[in-house]
Amino acid sequence: MSVGVSTSAPLSPTSGTSVGMSTFSIMDYVVFVLLLVLSLAIGLYHACRGWGRHTVGELLMADRKMGCLPVALSLLATFQSAVAILGVPSEIYRFGTQYWFLGCCYFLGLLIPAHIFIPVFYRLHLTSAYEYLELRFNKTVRVCGTVTFIFQMVIYMGVVLYAPSLALNAVTGFDLWLSVLALGIVCTVYTALGGLKAVIWTDVFQTLVMFLGQLAVIIVGSAKVGGLGRVWAVASQHGRISGFELDPDPFVRHTFWTLAFGGVFMMLSLYGVNQAQVQRYLSSRTEKAAVLSCYAVFPFQQVSLCVGCLIGLVMFAYYQEYPMSIQQAQAAPDQFVLYFVMDLLKGLPGLPGLFIACLFSGSLSTISSAFNSLATVTMEDLIRPWFPEFSEARAIMLSRGLAFGYGLLCLGMAYISSQMGPVLQAAISIFGMVGGPLLGLFCLGMFFPCANPPGAVVGLLAGLVMAFWIGIGSIVTSMGSSMPPSPSNGSSFSLPTNLTVATVTTLMPLTTFSKPTGLQRFYSLSYLWYSAHNSTTVIVVGLIVSLLTGRMRGRSLNPATIYPVLPKLLSLLPLSCQKRLHCRSYGQDHLDTGLFPEKPRNGVLGDSRDKEAMALDGTAYQGSSSTCILQETSL
């Protein structure tokens, strides 16, 4: 789940060139090519099925007919990128199992979207999450949110395509640009032609490939070192099994509180308001199916985290028994997993290819989701509002053209990434930097009825400035920091971003480092608190500006865009207390939207099927007393 968070310094274009390379067998190439062919076939099947009868709603929203399980697996695959597949085992190998406590944040990180964001978005019948911003604020705020999202995804998708290809090239000699082009072209074709339905079903297939590849490594690796019991014993003997680190200091990179609570805000920025995920919720048959798909992600996320952590422990136990070569130990940390896989599986034709297919499945799922979501927001937020007269056929052609265009842009960004060198780490971090302010913008609109458009715009800008100040300052500071000594098994590693003295001294108690002070300490804020810090900045600044500019006076407020925090809290009180407060109803499900006409979707009003689906979930927003709305607005 660690999207945008590489646990080590990113690969440089020259890293690993002096390290001995392993080679692929014919069977490995067959397995890898089979992944690409099957992914392309799934996309072409959905493109050819019903060719000529496709609608924009089918292309961008899978005709809002997707079931719970495929949506859940697609939600998981969207941000289970190759960066996480390489980064999580590397984190566990170098620093121990403290990162495993990230699983504690998944419960709230998925429960909140299921019961707050999904009901609001689904009942407004949106296509783009940023339509909400226009309904709540105005068109300017919508455009600002859309442009911010496009910037976030365009920067990130090039890195997601380039980084695993570079790692594969450094370890196996597999041609760098051949793999980049193959992935980019295959992904662009099936996303542009097949639309969201093709993306979701290829995500399902690629998720299975990811789990198979990782399980193969765990099974063979644990058998090689004497079983999982032996793996755990070796890791425990060398201090890699971490207990609860209860230090409340937010400047410590990984503690229980940082992982369990700071991680919640990171999860909300991904599963609550990111267009790629919101689009999947909205493609579900009913609101209930969307909520269930969000619930279903929880066990899958836990299994995914456990698998990544187990690979790190197996790798540690393996290299205790079969030490790395000096050249391998000096490679970039994110290459450790690939070296381990090639060392472990080199005598088993096809299995190295299966793991590489697993790695590139992570890239394909992330990139295809990016293409589809970018095409959707560009079409719905930047083009259709200005050209509402587009015919269905022209809109379909333009949507596919946008997906193709973003595919070419992704290849261009991959080339730019190859020229970045150390700046590549900043590009990877941008995804996390931008997610927090966008989360804050949606929370400002949803939970604070007094927030107005000027407050939203100024708050978003303040959040982005704060995000880039801390994020880039952290990267620059870490580049100039000293390197810690090698761990006990003789391999070396680089000091990761904002790693503080508390973490290092836990692993290496004989080594001391001076504590950062002043701005340097400010920059050492754990990356898991970035979303919380930056979203809070947006909310605080947005509220201050809103209060100074007259709140929502003279502007209409659609109650369907507000999540009724106060009524929800009051509904927990005894009925007698509720009567004394003169509130008849407190639920979000009882807001009256009769004053606000139904929003057209893709240029037309919802059809009978949509109304039937809404009836299955219960009638939304009916019959509230005005008292509740006034009380909520008074917040």
Curated annotation (Swiss-Prot):
Topology of the protein relative to the lipid bilayer: Multi-pass membrane protein
Xref: InterPro entries: Na/Glc_symporter_sf (IPR038377), Na/solute_symporter (IPR001734), Na/solute_symporter_CS (IPR018212), Sodium:Solute_Symporter_SSF (IPR051163)
Outcome of substituting T627A: No effect on biotin transport
Gene behind this protein: SLC5A6
Protein name, as recorded: Sodium-dependent multivitamin transporter
GO molecular function: biotin transmembrane transporter activity; iodide transmembrane transporter activity; monocarboxylate:sodium symporter activity; pantothenate transmembrane transporter activity; pantothenate:sodium symporter activity; sodium-dependent multivitamin transmembrane transporter activity; vitamin transmembrane transporter activity
Job of this protein: Sodium-dependent multivitamin transporter that mediates the electrogenic transport of pantothenate, biotin, lipoate and iodide. Functions as a Na(+)-coupled substrate symporter where the stoichiometry of Na(+):substrate is 2:1, creating an electrochemical Na(+) gradient used as driving force for substrate uptake. Required for biotin and pantothenate uptake in the intestine across the brush border membrane. Plays a role in the maintenance of intestinal mucosa integrity, by providing the gut mucosa with biotin.
Self-association and partners: Interacts with PDZD11.
Disease: Sodium-dependent multivitamin transporter deficiency: An autosomal recessive multisystemic metabolic disorder characterized by early infantile onset, progressive neurodegeneration, global developmental delay, and developmental regression with loss of early motor and cognitive milestones. Additional variable features include seizures, ataxia, spasticity, peripheral neuropathy, immune defects, and osteopenia. Treatment with biotin, pantothenic acid, and lipoate may result in clinical improvement. Peripheral motor neuropathy, childhood-onset, biotin-responsive: An autosomal recessive disorder characterized by distal muscle weakness and atrophy appearing late in the first decade of life. The disorder predominantly affects the upper limbs and hands, resulting in difficulties with fine motor skills. Some patients may have lower limb involvement, resulting in gait difficulties. Additional features may include spasticity, ataxia, and cerebellar signs. Sensation is intact, and patients have normal cognitive development.
Organism per entry: Homo sapiens
